[in-house]
Amino acid sequence: MAKAVYVGVGSKAHKMKKAYIGIGGKARKVKKMYIGDSSGKARLCYSAELEYGGTAPALSCGRVWMAGTSVGSYAMFAGGQNDSSCFDTVEAYNASRTKIAAAALRGPSAELAAASNGSYAFFAGGREAPKSDGKMAVDAYNSSLTRTAAARLPNARSLRLGGTRVGSYAVFAGGQPLYGDSMRLAYVTAYDSALTCTAASELTRGRSLVKGVTLGNYALFAGGDSGNIFSGNDGSLSNVDVYDSSLTHTTAADLSNSDSMYLYLSGAVAGSYAIFTNKSTSCDIYNASLTKTTATLLSMKREGVTGASVGEYAVFAGGISPVLSTIVDVCDASLTRISTTGLSVARREPTAATVGDTLLFAGGWDSTIHYGTYNTVDVYTA
């Protein structure tokens, strides 16, 4: 795992997050530090690079389509399904990889969404059975993992919705009310630290499978499924809706990579860049001013990749192309791709959650067999 240096401030030890050294009048970031031991050998004492940390205790059972987020000192994974059932299970991990069973959701749920506002982790919507319709329920967990029933999604039951944080809000967007129906939703709902529910301006187009990420003071909701397979790209949409910390709605330039489709879009943030991709090595990149560029950041084209953020890194894990992959692509804050150890088990669509400098990829499935689900939890540290 990553090595750390601590400095004393006010009689307390604080972890040093970044180190710089002056070279030619410029500050250069230190990636690794070594110290000489008594035998004269150089020992690594500090690393600012993302590293594979092995596996954490496995999930209680193999599942896919969980939702993951964090609150306080815990990364949380909730719900999900296997080949025959959906689950209400909630499992939490701290930065030491200790697993804790939290209070269950108020009902089984798969294809739900998760987001945190700093005070609570929220799990919203989903479906109770493998082919059932959407739910309106929202469960909130505080930093002690105490569960509270938050206000229901106010406009419609929903599954396959997107979630992320902006400012003091956990925000949920889009989705679909019925499992096998073409109707899609444009509703956007925000929850604050008092569990107050606020309806924000709707998405520009109703869609499910929208991908939400947080970029500074913005929440970006990108891509998704229109429900109309005859509308081009099998119904996928390239829209990018943006909400600021006051929930003011604007739009950014559309996604540009026609090969990526935009269904099951992956998204993550590296430093001051939001990165989106799927079915391609090319990525659409939005900076802090919401200006879009494109670049080749992934090592291999694959579908079902999970994107997540830890420290200043964007991490894209797993997928299938055409066989299941263990590949983990890492992009740093300068958009440089870094190689790292892959997943311990090849799979697509693991669920990600980050606590502090620790990123966990949990569960996932093998789409080449009938719902072959995994309970593996891989750990990366920044």
Go through each PLM region and give its residues:
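Kelch-like beta-propeller repeat domains
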Residues: 2-12, 22, 35-382
